[in-house]
Design a protein with these regions (language model features):
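Glycine/alanine-rich phosphate-binding loops at beta-alpha junctions
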Residues: 28, 34-39, 56
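An anion-binding catalytic pocket shared by soluble metabolic enzymes
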Residues: 64, 69-72
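Catalytic core of PPM/PP2C metal-dependent serine/threonine phosphatase domains
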Residues: 108-142
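ATP-dependent adenylate-handling active sites, centered on carboxylate activation for C-N bond formation
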Residues: 1, 7-20, 40-48, 100, ...
Length: 341
């Protein structure tokens, strides 16, 4: 995973300094140990003539195009800049389409396709993306900042708006570095957490911070933010199908889904519990891989709670390079670190 953060606001006492942006970016260093980059632009104005400061920070975990694809990245003429956390599975198809329309790519990464897609489609571009993502785009042509989150919200994205300024980040840790962000605990959020074991969007544990909902994008311009849905789940089916058709369709969809997620310039692995879900995914991945898949399972020293024997059976059947890890009672010593991350 990677991490993104940043801010947009009037270039006054509320501007983000390079030092503050670095602290916001370093707060999520665990999300991206491979690279850290920041960018600040101050030669922008809003519709009322106010000077704007745009700050972007990025922590990278390299998966595709290890040497290139550094962020924040810009389009050909530097009028659009972006930070992006996630992976776009259909980037190959998108790239070929965009190159056919004359776009020039500077990297081989999946994220650059978002930039050029946005140039052509604006906020409608998110409908074309197949993947998991949290995106921040500065559009200097329109003097606006756009946030977007993938369809089911696999990648997190938090934001706050105060004093005509937008602050955003992959985690609350980045926003907490900004002193005037309201971090007062929301009692309603505590009630929701105790009821559901999580805080439903758009709320968070803090009164002054919101989560961008899955399948939504937000546009921040002239000190105001508007949120819109770009995708929703359609539970209907076009026509009734037979059980054997449903079985084959599920097989095709699952195989295609796993295949898309195996695009990588680094070694891949599979978390294998021995249950139906992880066993199916590992089996499909093994069928798509030219070399044995690496699989991992987590066990416990108490037999009643340990299911790694099932994982070992599946691993042996599939011929994976399997490794078992055991959680010991001493693991409680790192509980604070686990909660923090």
């Amino acid at each position: 995973m990677c991490g993104i953060t940043g801010a947009v606001g009037r270039n006054s006492k509320h501007a983000i300094s390079p030092e503050l942006l670095t602290r916001m970016t370093d707060a999520i260093s665990h999300r991206g140990p491979d690279d850290s980059q920041t960018w600040i632009g101050t030669d922008h104005k809003d519709a009322y003539g106010h000077d704007l400061c745009v700050a972007l920070g990025f922590r990278r975990l390299s998966i595709i195009d290890l040497e290139g694809a550094r962020q924040p990245m810009a389009n050909e003429d530097g009028t659009i800049r972006m930070v992006f956390n996630g992976e776009i599975y259909n980037y190959g198809t998108l790239r070929r389409r965009l190159e056919g329309k004359g776009h020039q790519f500077a990297t081989h990464g999946d994220g650059e396709s978002i930039l050029h897609l946005y140039e052509d489609y604006g906020t409608d571009c998110f409908e074309h993306l197949n993947g998991m993502f949290a995106i921040g785009i500065w559009d200097s042509n329109r003097n606006r900042f756009v946030l977007a989150r993938d369809r089911i919200g696999q990648k997190p994205l938090y934001y706050a708006v105060k004093d005509h300024r937008l602050i955003f980040g992959s985690e609350l840790k980045s926003l907490a570095k900004v002193q005037d962000i309201c971090t007062e605990i929301d009692p309603a959020a505590i009630d929701e957490f105790l009821t559901y074991q999580y805080v439903p969007h758009p709320g968070t544990i803090w009164k002054g911070v919101r989560k961008l909902a899955p399948g939504h994008f937000a546009v921040f311009e002239n000190g105001n933010i508007s949120v819109q849905r770009y995708w929703d789940f359609d539970p209907s089916i076009e026509r009734p199908i037979q059980a054997n058709q449903a079985t084959e369709t599920l097989r095709e969809l699952l195989t295609d889904s796993v295949k898309l997620r195996m695009q990588s310039d680094v070694p891949l692995g599979s978390f294998l519990s021995g249950g139906i879900d992880s066993s199916l995914i590992t089996a499909i991945a093994s069928g798509q891989s030219s070399s044995p898949v690496r699989s991992f399972s987590i066990g416990f020293p108490v037999a009643d709670f340990d299911e790694t024997a099932y994982a070992a059976q599946v691993a042996k059947h599939l011929g994976t390079q399997h490794q078992r890890f055991e959680v010991m009672p001493s693991g409680v010593d790192v509980i604070d670190q686990l909660v923090w991350h």
